[in-house]
């Protein structure tokens, strides 16, 4: 098995490996200050010097999250303050609010951007994703997941819960957040009739990718696209090359000595081929590598 990102050279895949932080497809403000007032990096921001050169292999995994079920119903659970909550852990959100002129439109995890997932009268929404600084995706928290034991994986899951609940609590309650934003986020909370045995948070972390089997065949960027049909097909996939962000990095601002801004790294979602996303999955990806 393998984990992390292979290099471009491993399978001749142009999309493989580490990538340069960029604004491609990113929603939200630019020029978000990456530093605390004392010069330290904000929590959840990484130093770009830790990033491998573009195209090289690394151990990064795309961001995990809980697909939380939230509600605007009167019986919703108001955003709970997570244990050991420190508002300064969420200064990245504050910096993004300041860079956007007080607007929270960059935060893509609440309606109208939330995904309606439940029919009927109850106002329920399933949180998902976000190619933005303000998202329930938080890269880097999953570091070491692929080789970790259950105890460490429980810690990683708890760290995601703290980040997610803390972000919403901050947005709905912190006095530094503009009142219209607090009011907007305060209209929502956790569903009272979902996951009650787990504090209304799904017990399962959404692990988008972890260990991968290296079989007799390996599905690669090139093998998916051509040929699209396989003689030993056992199924059909139908999704784009969809990589969620793997890092929020502090990147030097050109011409401004000592100034660092937050940029995202790793996200892309081009179509498989010719604007469509279906592809055959060959049986040989599940059989042991010969030789």
Regions found by a protein language model. Give the residues of each.
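Flavin (FAD/FMN)-binding glycine-rich loop and adjacent Rossmann-like elements that form
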Residues: 1-291
């Amino acid at each position: 098995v393998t984990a992390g990102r292979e290099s471009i050279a491993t399978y001749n895949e142009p999309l493989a490996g580490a990538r340069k932080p960029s604004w491609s497809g990113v929603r939200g403000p630019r020029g978000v200050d990456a530093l605390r007032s004392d010069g330290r990096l904000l929590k959840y921001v990484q130093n770009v010097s830790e990033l491998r050169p573009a195209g090289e292999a690394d151990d990064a995994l795309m961001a995990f999250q809980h697909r939380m079920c939230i509600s605007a119903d009167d019986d919703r659970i108001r955003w709970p303050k997570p244990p050991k909550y420190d508002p300064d852990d969420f200064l990245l959100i504050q910096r993004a609010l300041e860079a956007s002129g007080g607007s929270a439109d960059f935060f893509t995890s609440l309606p109208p951007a939330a995904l309606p997932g439940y029919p009927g009268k109850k106002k329920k929404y399933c949180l998902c994703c976000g190619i933005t600084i303000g998202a329930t995706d938080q890269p880097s928290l999953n570091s070491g997941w692929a080789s970790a034991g259950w105890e460490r994986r429980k810690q990683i899951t708890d760290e995601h819960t703290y980040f997610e609940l803390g972000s919403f609590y901050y947005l709905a309650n912190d006095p530094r957040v503009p009142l219209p934003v607090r009011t907007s986020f305060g209209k929502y909370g956790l569903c009272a009739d979902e996951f009650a045995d787990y504090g209304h948070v799904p017990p399962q972390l959404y692990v988008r990718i972890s260990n991968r089997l290296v079989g007799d065949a390996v599905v690669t960027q090139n093998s998916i696209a051509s040929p699209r049909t396989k003689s030993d097909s056992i199924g059909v996939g139908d999704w784009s090359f969809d990589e969620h962000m793997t890092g929020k990095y502090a990147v030097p601002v050109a011409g401004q000595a000592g100034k660092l801004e937050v940029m995202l790294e790793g996200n892309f979602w081009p179509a498989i081929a010719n604007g469509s996303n279906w592809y055959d999955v060959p049986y040989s990806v599940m059989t042991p590598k010969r030789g």
